[in-house]
Amino acid sequence: MLKKQQRIAAASPKTVLGSPMANADLVADSIKRASGLDVDFIVFPELALAGASLGSLLSHPHMLDLSGRALESICRATENLSITAAVGYPCEINGSVRSAVALINRGSVLATSFSDCAEAPFGFIPSVEYHLSKPRSIFPRNINVVFGNELLSSKLSVPDGNVTLIPSFLNATAHSDRLISEALRRYTAISGFAAAYAAPNSGESSSFFLYDGLCAISAGGEIIAMTEPFSDDPFVYADVNAAWLASAKAVPVMQQPTYYLSQKPERAAHECRRILRLQAEALRRRLEHTGGRGFIIGVSGGLDSALAAIAAVKAADMMGLPRSGVLGVSMPGFGTSIRTRENSRKLCEALGCSFREISIVDACAAHLEAIGHGTDKRDVVYENAQARERTQILLDLANMENLLDVGTGDLSEAALGWTTFGGDHLAQYGVNASLPKTVIRRVVAEAKAEFREAADTLQDILDTPVSPELLPSQAGEIAQKTEELLGSYEMHDFFIYQFVINKEKPSAIVEKAIRELPFDPGEIRRAFDVFIRRFFTQQYKRNCAPESPHILASISPALWRMGSDVLPDGSFREGNAGGTENA
């Protein structure tokens, strides 16, 4: 038990990715800042000296050497300070690169602990049961180090000590704030310890994950200090004493997500707002990295491009850029309806974006004639030529005007392969890629309150049937309705969650869908057969998908690894699938 009051802190100074010496200076400055506040213990994120998102470069001998030198630099800079700091860095042990945490006090490394995680951390995947770390040296009696991924493990035991420092590499998701808060409260309630938690920040790569620099202090089953997500100054401290630790409330139950969004309306609304914030942060980080002057989006008058436009506008606002730096491009083709064409323009005008309309009809007709196809044959070539023409226009304009081409494709489309290879399948960054269509609908609905100037147009977009609009229609109406062709997205998004996240057996997924979804059993079985067939045969598109942030559920090549020539046999569906669909 704690004998006296102690002050503990957590900090996540903005990472300079791949620059250990620069990070060492930032860490040393934070240690000095904490020491000036009479802090006794401070924790920094896992791999803070190199960057948690550095990937394979973490194991490069040069990076390991620089990280070791950076650690020595921190020791020299803090040799006269009594504060104890937990600093994360990559380290080679017996020929294997591991995430290490050094406990530094008065210029010396008191102890080091090593995680059993692979050299390239793979992000926040709550369903994974992590291996626990094995300390390689003895810690002072009153200090304990637990890695962030262990905090979520059901196998985490309570070691000796009364202060737990938790360096983490866990990324930000729609649910991570709640999960980490509940895990900290549970840990401190059970252990009787105080705990300080620090996660990586927005200086990390946004290629596949986002990091919000979450820092928190917990004691007695309560969160007593926590930073705001993506804070400009992720640094917190708090005083804890024996009274705090003795006053633990009832042990909180860790509730893993049971579906994409909470069943509680207030929590679901919070998650929708957080999703949009994460999307905007991802775009901000990517634009800062590329040095572009703004964003370009192909606006179709549909849900996906509406959300991408909103996220881009929010990112521009956060960066202090004019909304005119967001360019929405409408590219009407053979099947574009009057309604979606008008909504594309109205949305951009309401949001204050720049707007441009470029018809692709003549360009596509010329292309089809040039390859000997003609415009009277309404097949897959006819449809895909339009999608590829739009992508070419967007990428060329992005180059010409120094803009970031923001992809609009979503998780549902990626799972079903409902994209054109080399067409809307490509972009410079896919901001919607981890969000299913049904969630996008709810995020857009929630966004109406924030973007009131566009609320009427957003509502009309919400009321518009989902369609690729690639086939001509009569009287300017929508000819193709995706859910009439594939089945309801409510079913397909359910299948994705159960198959990819819960990893349920196909038979169990169908049985669960019949129990829980408002559809005829025969319709559910037909839709599931479509889902499984297309999920397997369309993998080749996902294997070369653009980089995208993992916010809800990802089947990007960084997280879902599967050969494109794997076919669903009797293990996954009745009968054998044959052939591939090279759309």
Where are these regions (language model features)?
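ATP/NTP-dependent adenylation/nucleotidyl-transfer catalytic domains that generate, transfer
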Residues: K4-R7, G18, G192-F193, S205, ...
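Enzyme catalytic cores with a strong preference for nitrogen-chemistry domains
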Residues: M1-G298, A309, K314-G325
